[in-house]
Amino acid sequence: MRVVVIAIGRLKQGPERELAERYRERFDDLGRKLGFRGPEIHEIGESRARDAPTRIAEEAAAIAALIPDKAVLVTLDERGDSLDSAGFARKLGGWRDQSTAQAIFVIGGADGLSPELRRKAKLSVSFGAATWPHQMVRVMLLEQLYRAATILSGHPYHRA
């Protein structure tokens, strides 16, 4: 199963980018043994429109252009479901076991995601009630993807 992360905003050089890349590489290495490919990262520049509704609409159009019809869409949203790591791993493993071609994880910009994208999502995940910078959300998502792979493989990284 191909795993894709679409993120509004670009990670600049620095510790966040290095940490994100470390978890991306770890997932790629372990994930291949489990039937996963990726994660591919697609960065979309933030809209420069003057008002939030226009920014959300422009960003949603750019995101939608990267999502094939049959992909499983997962949004990262503060209104989403709070999953523990084992539950997240079960979701990911379940999609793989159902021969899902792609799981696409979407991280919105500062104004959030469009209601239409949120409705299309098979799952919406929250990393808690707090609002997080998109750079941190990307690192946390990539870490959870790696952690899910370790859970699915029985690797001792996850010690819950």
Swiss-Prot record:
Residues reported in the UniProt entry to bind S-adenosyl-L-methionine = L76, G108
Instruction: Name the EC number(s).
Output: 2.1.1.177
Q: Name one Pfam family in it.
A: SPOUT_MTase
Keyword Cytoplasm attributed: yes
Lineage of the native species?
A: Bacteria, Pseudomonadati, Pseudomonadota, Alphaproteobacteria, Hyphomicrobiales
The record's family statement is: Belongs to the RNA methyltransferase RlmH family.
Cross-referenced InterPro entries: Alpha/beta_knot_MTases (IPR029028), RlmH-like (IPR003742), tRNA_m1G_MTases_N (IPR029026)
Alphabetical list of CDD domains matching this protein: RlmH-like (cd18081)
**Name of the protein in question:** Ribosomal RNA large subunit methyltransferase H
Species of provenance = Rhodopseudomonas palustris (strain BisB18)
Q: Give the matching Gene3D superfamilies.
A: 3.40.1280.10
Listed under GO cellular component are: cytoplasm
Q: Where in the cell is it found?
A: Cytoplasm
Q: Which GO terms describe its molecular function?
A: rRNA (pseudouridine-N3-)-methyltransferase activity
Q: Which reaction does it catalyse?
A: pseudouridine(1915) in 23S rRNA + S-adenosyl-L-methionine = N(3)-methylpseudouridine(1915) in 23S rRNA + S-adenosyl-L-homocysteine + H(+)
Q: How does it assemble?
A: Homodimer.
Q: What is its main location?
A: cytoplasm
Q: Which stretches are annotated as coiled coil?
A: none
Write the record's keywords in alphabetical order, separated by commas.
Answer: Cytoplasm, Methyltransferase, rRNA processing, S-adenosyl-L-methionine, Transferase
Any idea what job this protein has? Answer: Specifically methylates the pseudouridine at position 1915 (m3Psi1915) in 23S rRNA.
Task: Report if keyword Cell wall biogenesis/degradation is assigned.
Answer: no
